[in-house]
Every structure is written in structure tokens, then in C-alpha cells.
Swiss-Prot record:
<comment type="function">
    <text>Specifically catalyzes the hydrolysis of UTP to UMP and diphosphate in vitro, albeit at apparently slow rate. Shows no activity towards ATP, GTP, CTP, dTTP and ITP as substrates.</text>
</comment>
<dbReference type="GO" id="GO:0036221">
    <property type="term" value="F:UTP diphosphatase activity"/>
</dbReference>
<protein>
    <recommendedName>
        <fullName>UTP pyrophosphatase</fullName>
        <ecNumber>3.6.1.-</ecNumber>
    </recommendedName>
</protein>
<dbReference type="InterPro" id="IPR002725">
    <property type="entry name" value="YgjP-like_metallopeptidase"/>
</dbReference>
<dbReference type="Pfam" id="PF01863">
    <property type="entry name" value="YgjP-like"/>
</dbReference>
<keyword id="KW-0378">Hydrolase</keyword>
<dbReference type="InterPro" id="IPR053136">
    <property type="entry name" value="UTP_pyrophosphatase-like"/>
</dbReference>
<keyword id="KW-0546">Nucleotide metabolism</keyword>
<dbReference type="GO" id="GO:0000166">
    <property type="term" value="F:nucleotide binding"/>
</dbReference>
<keyword id="KW-0547">Nucleotide-binding</keyword>
<dbReference type="GO" id="GO:0009117">
    <property type="term" value="P:nucleotide metabolic process"/>
</dbReference>
Amino acid sequence: MSNLTYLQGYPEQLLSQVRTLINEQRLGDVLAKRYPGTHDYATDKALWQYTQDLKNQFLRNAPPINKVMYDNKIHVLKNALGLHTAVSRVQGGKLKAKVEIRVATVFRNAPEPFLRMIVVHELAHLKEKEHNKAFYQLCCHMEPQYHQLEFDTRLWLTQLSLGQNKI
């Protein structure tokens, strides 16, 4: 139980509260009360439209996104929740860049705020490549509750990994 993989780096006092919720088997209930239901973006096409809507709202001048999809290999292979890639190819003597965003399949059945947090995170990489202060400021600009949602997403993933009742 001391190995809370998704919550490493958080203060011990906070981890103690999480352990209490886990021991009392209340973590799933707390999350379900805070984030009832799931989102309607279960297909790659719906995810692409959702991502485009957020991009057009906050990052109009960012490079276009060529592909957005759920990827069932992300979690296992990369130990990540989402990936952004920019692939450069030579096409007719010119260099073309293609931008892709991939979201872990586990978010297909997640509450909408958790999906939003992941998409906002990956969109922020269009402007800021590194996880620095400017990156997190951009995330908070697009989603004011970004840090709370990131923590709650980590709680949700912890709860899923323990096999407790799901949201």
C-alpha cells in the first residue's frame, strides 16, 4: 500500500489521507461524488473534435494537429497518460511536420474533467515542449483547475490500479 505509484512526489500528509481513504475503501466513492459519470468522447473522431475545439479556443496560432486518437499501448510502453509527437518528413523537397496527440485508452471511460486535463496538457506541448513554469501557466490558462484535476486524475488511476469500485 505504501507504493502509490501515481502519487509519488506529493507530501506525506496528503499521502496519509489517501491511504486512509484506500483502507476504508472510500476512495472510489469520494471520486464518484466529485466527478459523476463519464464523457461522450469514446471514439477517435469525437476525441479529435474535442481536442480541436479546445485548441481553437485557446491556441489558434499553434500548428495544426494532424491526428488525435486513443492509444492502448501508451500506458504499458511509455508509462505515460498521453503523448504528443511531431514527425518531420521530407515531401517533395520540403520538410513537412505532422503533429499527433495520443491519449491512453483508460481515459475512454473517464470523467470528462480528467480527459480535459490530459488534452490540455498535450495541447500545451504545442507551445511549450518542456514541463517548465511557462508550460504549467499555459495549462492553468486553458484549465484553471488544472492542478486539482491532475491530482484527482492520479487518485482515480490509483483507485483503478487497486481494483476498487470504479466511477
